[in-house]
Each structure stands twice: as C-alpha cells, then as structure tokens.
Design a protein with these regions (language model features):
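Structural recognition of an alpha-helix C-terminal capping motif at a helix-to-coil junction
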Residues: 38-45, 58-70
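Arg/Lys-rich amphipathic alpha helix in sigma70-family domain 2
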Residues: 55, 66-87, 106
Length: 171
C-alpha cells in the first residue's frame, strides 16, 4: 500500500518541527516558533514537489530530515548577515553574570550549552542535533547530510571538542 502525502505529514510533522526548532535555536524571540513553523511548512512544500518521484521503499523519515537540513542551511545563509554573533556572545555573557548559583545552575548550564551549540558551524550543529537531540545513528545522519558515516562522526567529534573547550574556557 502506497503512503499518502497526508499520512507522511501526520507521521512526521511534529518530529521535523522539533528538529528544526533545535537546529535553528530558540533565541528568545517571541516569533521564533512562527519562524520554525514557516520553515517546517517549506520542508513539506519541497517534499510535496518531489513526493511523486519518491520510491515506495524509500526511507521517508531520512528523506524529510535531509530536506529539513537543506532548508535550515538555506535559512542559516539568509540569516548570516543579519545575525551578529558578537551580540549573541555578549548576551550570553550577561545572562551568565546575572545568573544565580543556586538551584538554577543546571538550567544555566543548559542555556550555555545551547548558546554554544548555536554558535557551531552549520554542519557540526546539524550533526550534534541529529545525534544527541533526535537520537539518530551515524548511518542515518550520513544519509540526511549527504556525507559519509566517517564525516558525520568527525563533525560530531569536532563539535563536542569545541563545546568542551569553550566550557573549560568559561570556568
């Protein structure tokens, strides 16, 4: 039985939205959810355009993740000139200085890590997000990002190394 496009949306919309939310980062803007929803719609519009040519035995989930990743990378390129990384770092530093050292320390650490992940190169950010937040294995990541499994592993390794160094520098 062939999968209908509507079924594909029902099965994967929330998962793709969550992936894009994590990949794009929630920078505290009120309209961040709207931006991610718009990007999710773009993913499914692109998927609809090529759905008829998709082989029935294809991995639909990986195919959607690949489209989502490409849409996110396109969005990153569009936003690059608008986003000032220095202001993000300054804002993170101010948040860290004003944070209390009581029970909110775990939440503060999560915010620091989230800010650092958002500052990673796009491919490393995608690999870390797919591996640790979406819980995908390296073959799936490689398929989604059109790279080798070794390339996916290397990007995750480099990202983790970068995050560790940045966290050590903050201490």
């Amino acid at each position: 039985m062939a999968l209908r496009f509507e079924e594909l949306i029902e099965r994967h919309h929330d998962e793709i939205f969550a992936y894009l939310w994590r990949l794009m980062g929630n920078d505290g803007r009120r309209d961040a959810a709207t931006d991610v929803e718009d990007l999710t719609q773009d993913v499914f519009l692109r998927a609809y355009d090529s759905f008829a040519g998709l082989r029935p035995n294809s991995n639909h989930r990986a195919w959607l993740y690949k489209i989502a990743t490409h849409c996110a990378f396109t969005q990153f390129r569009r936003m690059k000139h608008r986003r000032d990384k220095l202001s993000l770092l300054k804002r993170s530093a101010v948040e860290l200085e004003t944070a209390s050292d009581d029970s909110s320390s775990r939440k503060d650490m999560e915010q620091r890590v989230r800010a650092l992940v958002n500052g990673l190169p796009a491919k490393q950010k995608a690999c870390v997000t797919l591996r640790y937040l979406q819980d995908l294995d390296y073959p799936e990541i490689a398929q989604i990002l059109s790279c080798s499994q070794e390339g996916a592993r290397a990007n995750v390794y480099q990202a983790i190394r970068h995050l560790r160094l940045a966290l050590e520098e903050e201490k």
